[in-house]
């Protein structure tokens, strides 16, 4: 029996496009893709808006094949506490730069404290327009370069501001393989050699979770080697054009040990989002 496949990039929103709002169609397409369980989350540009309505609608969709992430205003940590207390949602999606605030900003201190205390998974996704450079409007660079770069800058800000040191038990998932953050680990470590406090950057980076939406087998292999198989989650970016229709294929192309592959294609997501799931539930029926 193969490992259960769980993809977390199933963006769900009440929009005009059927791909965004028709759960039956979403599950049909995931059947064709070989995905057993989907994780639905808000469209990033709606994060923090109509919080209660979105969270209630998403929670109502939760079931055997559907796990959900909600949304909150990160400057109102009481929203996260209330959402997690409800119990139907195990985490939230936030923009990489919510309301123009980078993730290490003191204004978000309460949010990170609440996220650690409640055990919430915090999925960080770029806003798709994080940089106003005119060149980003050319050649689809706002997406191919701008999106991962936005995540990179804000995650580096989170690390450099000491948030990961203050809250070592945070569960933070970075979209698109963490952007280019892993490739910058040497530069970030060098900066800590010349400036206090001299933290272990490599160890801090390995506290992040990253997804598999990198579109390159060798890039994904590097992520698994650096972060470890227990920190990489399967993603699809469904139904967007830069997503992948068969998300598990790139993982299986790595020819990893079966236990490591099982973690990436489903086990890690279930551990974070469905902690009551028994081990045998993590295998395909």
Could you describe each region identified by the protein language model?
Residues 97, 127-128, 159, 178, ...:
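Catalytic metal-binding/acid-base residues of hydrolase active sites
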Residues 36-154:
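Active-site gating/metal-coordination segments in enzymes
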Residues 1-37, 170, 214-233, 240-285:
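Mid-to-C-terminal alpha-helical segments outside catalytic/metal-binding sites
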Residues 132-138, 178-193, 220-226, 242-253:
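Histidine/acidic-residue-rich catalytic or RNA/ligand-binding cores of hydrolases
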Residues 1-20, 130-151, 188-207:
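Active-site gating loops and adjacent loop-to-helix segments of metal-dependent hydrolytic enzymes
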Residues 162, 166-203:
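Aromatic-lined glycan-binding groove of carbohydrate-active enzymes
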Residues 30, 38, 58, 68, ...:
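Divalent metal-coordination and catalytic microenvironments
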